[in-house]
Amino acid sequence: METATIIVIFVSSLLVGITAYSVYTAFGPASKNLRDPFEEHED
C-alpha cells in the first residue's frame, strides 16, 4: 500500500473512534454523572 492510503485510513479511523467515544460519553451509562448547567440555573 502507499503511504498516503495508510495515513488516510489511520486518520479516518481516529475520527470515527473519537466520534464514537463522544457519543458513548453523551448518551451512555456515564451520562448520568454529567451536570446540566441549564437545569441548575433557575430564573
UniProtKB/Swiss-Prot annotation:
Its main location: plastid. GO terms for cellular component: chloroplast thylakoid membrane. One of its GO terms (biological process) is photosynthesis. The chain crosses the membrane at residues 4-24. It holds the Pfam family PsbN. Keywords: Chloroplast, Membrane, Plastid, Thylakoid, Transmembrane, Transmembrane helix. It is a single-pass membrane protein. It is found in: Plastid, Chloroplast thylakoid membrane. It comes from the Eukaryota. InterPro entries: PSII_PsbN. Belongs to the PsbN family. HAMAP family: PSII_PsbN (MF_00293). May play a role in photosystem I and II biogenesis. This is Protein PsbN. The lineage of its organism: Eukaryota, Sar, Stramenopiles, Ochrophyta, Bacillariophyta.
